[in-house]
Amino acid sequence: MGDNKSAQQPDVNEQIKVRMEKLKNLQDAGKDPFQITKYDVTHHTDEIRAIYEAHEKELLGDRPAVNTEGLDEQQAREAVNADYNERRAIMDASPINVSFAGRMMFKRVMGKASFCNIADLKGRMQAYISRDAIGEEAYADFKKSDIGDIFGIKGFIFRTKTGEISVHAEEITLLSKSLQVLPEKFHGITDTDMRYRQRYVDLIMNPEVKDTFVKRSKIIKEIRKFLDGRDFMEVETPTLVSNAGGAAARPFETCLLYTSP
């Protein structure tokens, strides 16, 4: 385990150095993301998904699904594509414009267009980034971006051919440059001790862990609300502190002491 960490450390340090150079280049070009202190957000990701589904039901609710029975593979593909294009034309005729922001968790660049996943407080949303839509300079900057960077995106909602609700970006703004390297997407944080000591990373990488903390917070909030309504007083009684103490209990060292300088 230790040898593996040592082997990975130089690579991580090199990536951090590259990211710092990217930040410096942005600052030298007058595009310092840390100068942006406010970004107008109209919707969270869950709201974007909900309003599009409602709008889609309103416009396409009575439209039957495409019938491919009796068609060969090529004909079926053409029929499905034609149906998608018709549905897309109907939806695009009355677009829903949104503005949202979040951390980029995934990016796939494909020439003149790219896809990325943006995670915010309420979930994740795919964004379609096109050079023709946002401009060559903005697209070139986006291609240089890293996983973990925080973006603000303005555009309209649509559904891809694979059925995923996405946002077609018309404007993209880098709000914060991530200098630290997030764990690898598919394996995440494999070190259990690191998960507990660096909860902020665990919450970024694992939505299910975040969901657990959200539920815990709501439960504690309701318990406090219940007791406050009955004039109970909350008294903090820490069970683990930095100094040894407690009657005849034998002092012991913790990870807190072990990692302290």
Regions found by a protein language model. Give the residues of each.
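Extended, domain-scale alpha-helical bundle/helix-rich regions
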Residues: 2-11
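Extended, charge-rich, solvent-exposed interface segments
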Residues: 10, 14-18, 133-150, 154-230, ...
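OB-fold nucleic-acid-binding modules
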Residues: 11-97
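Structural detector for short beta-strands of small beta-barrel domains
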Residues: 97-110
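OB-fold (S1/OB) nucleic-acid-binding surfaces
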Residues: 113-133
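Beta-rich nucleic-acid/ligand-interaction surfaces
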Residues: 237-254
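Conserved small/polar residues in nucleotide/adenosyl-binding loops
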Residues: 258-261
